[in-house]
Amino acid sequence: MPMTAQRSMTHGIRSSGLAVVGILAATPARAQPTPIFDGAPPASWIAPPGVPGDSFTVFHTRKTFELGKVPARFVVHVSADNRYRLFVNGAQVSSGPQRSDVTHWRYETVDLAPQLHPGRNVIAALVWNWGAARPVAQHSHRTGFLLQGNSSAEAALVNSGYGWRVLVDSAYAPIVITSAAMGNYYAAVPGDSIDGARYPWGWEQPDYDDSAWYIVAPPTQTSAAAPLAAFDNAAGGGIVGLAKRRAMQPGDYGEVTGWQLEPRSIPPMEETLQRLARVRRATGVTTDGAFLRAAGDLVVPAHTTATLLLDQSHTTNAYPVLETSGGASSTVRLTYAEALVDSAGRKAHRDSIGGRSVRGVRDVFRPDGGAHHRFQTVYWRSFRYVQMEIVTADEPLRVHDLHGIYTAYPFSERARFASDLPWLADMWRMNWNGARIGAFETYMDTPYWEQLQYVGDTRIQGLISLYVSGDDRLLRQAIEHFDLSRIPEGLTASRYPSAVTQIIPPFSLIYVAMVHDYYMHRGDSAFVRERLAGVRGILDWYARHVDSTGMLGPMPHWNYVDWTNPWPRGVPPGADHGHSATISLLYAYALQRAAELEAGVGMRGAAEAYRTRRASVLAAVRSRAWDAKRGLFRDSPDTVSYSQQTNVLAILTDAAPVAEQRALMERVLSDTTLTRASYYFGFYVLEALRKAGLADRYIEQLAPWQGMLRLGLTSTPENPEPTRSDTHAWAAHPNYGLLATVLGVRPASAGFRTVLIAPSLGPLRRAEGRVPHPRGDIDVKLEADGERGLRAEITLPAGVTGVLEWRGQRRALRSGRQVVRL
């Protein structure tokens, strides 16, 4: 690589004519930076020379150091832009950083001691920036890597900066995936093209010879032994310390530049071996699929084109790993799909392959002829099917192995549900798979198409997580990110992190409900208090849009409520031009929850103000949108249209009087002329079903999920057929409903301090399950006793009490196990 003068990494300041590995100070710029960890000097950000900070870049960096003996702990903090994988003596120890934005950039804390040994040790990192091809969810300041020792002992040996070695890896190129090419909106990662002839095989191993790599060195060292000059930290630009946001220091002027680092708030992602199930078809080569089990090689002769269709048997997220020998100048193309399609792009039963092909995201690997070379993409792929196309040149290619490394947020499945209706168990597995692969460092609407964390999706995903896993950390992450996304008007972004701002005002109302969900299931008044400024800003924005009718007037932005055919872009009548009963009711829904939040933290005046505002909105909707002749609420008083969405919101907000809600819900279910709710808004339909006293009909409303199973789906789709995405966790909400409605386990007070168990068995004669609770597990075993009786065996965690409700009867519940007959 030529050594030429270049622009430095630090905020437009130029180097003094020297080629540099760019270094950015880890503290605000001044001549004598203050240590940030236990006396440790600050590390520096490093990046390759001659590469614009916003361009596609993959680089490797290494640091060799000696230890007389291995300490009990050797703690470092590590980050990168866009992402990194960190190795110690050849073993991977960390990856990240956790996704966020530049002003809340994350770092991981890792104890390297288990991988160290006396003598020579090597830390190595793979770092990449997708550049212009980066996914919409990916924020970026510029390419860089940072490793900071926790104390002066670690810092002296391994702080990134002077003495590290760096190599740009020219083997990588992005395969840009466009929405136009995909035939639908695509916002996720590009594919990888990896040329084995250019790849520095073994770069992460301690015995690799890195002597030809660039050295990060002080600017005064310009000899051949140290061909790269470090950027002088005192010259300008920097970031706050790793441990916490730094207080102002003498000479500071409050300027914020570059990455503002904060610790990782969630655990490392799960990574486990996952083998493809089978070869469904093959042309150009014969195989029994042994290579998928690493039990025998697939040998593709020279000058051969072979195509294999591989089936995982279920949708998944995984890093594809290919191990080959020989085959110089050959090409292996992997194309990933959730389902196969016909020539018109239509899906059928997900097991069906006849007359169908794979279209989608792809990677290309080019073996160089070496032995046992292992290709792995920098990021994971989402798929059920993988099409493997191999074209060989003058040498045969030997494929030893092709497998995946499954990855997802490490949710454990603590909850369980069993009943005398067997297909519910199949649905549970489908839903939970969709929920798992819809969660990584954030929740994701779809892991294949977008990988974006949307408010509407996330509220449902968060409830599933709480009820099935009991882990609230990813939900806290989401609430914090949506709070950070707020624009000056007061609204949250519809999705965050996102490098492209999108505003869906109704999602801001759903955000209020999400904060309330957390309040009811976890309490944590300090966390809730921190969110209240955002909640108030949202509701104040809506208050400014209430017109003289008492309903919401015209509203800007994208007023999406639900994907349903009669509504263009999912926007209900009246949303854009005024008087949407649907969104006015959603506003009232949020006001009620905000009132409870304010009351819960002692803000009684604010709570009463929200109740008053809610009552005013509901009165306006009743007087203007109620159609007494139809016995339904119109979507807007200015149109003659009716929907499930509007009428279930009328039930959930008590716009419909309590005494009339059951009859209204019956009409919602039976009137086929109504605009129907999608899988997403079906969550609110089923919540209204319970509130209207019809929860015994919950199971019968799950017919669409039976249909999913009949189609061979292994995760829940975005919409009914034809659906873009086969994995959309917003449709996995019946796992929540089985626990919260059928078993009937819900908080009776904030923080889940007390429990309400109100079962609704419907057609079931037996149901049992477990719901994780902050203090332990709630176990419920129910058996129908005759036509109207119930035998309930219930165990509550220590310190938790509650109430059992059944057909108008109530029984107090204590901690521990108890048997109740009603």
Region spans (language model):
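Alpha-helical support elements that line or immediately flank enzyme active sites
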Residues: 319-338, 386-391, 455-485, 515-525, ...
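Bacterial N-terminal signal peptides that target proteins for export
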Residues: 3-17
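Extracellular/oxidizing-compartment recognition motifs
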Residues: 32-445, 457, 473-474, 493-497, ...
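Non-catalytic C-terminal accessory modules of carbohydrate-active enzymes
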Residues: 179-180, 184-202, 344, 612, ...
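Solvent-exposed loop and edge beta-strand segments that line ligand/cofactor-binding
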Residues: 309-312, 376, 442-455, 496-508, ...
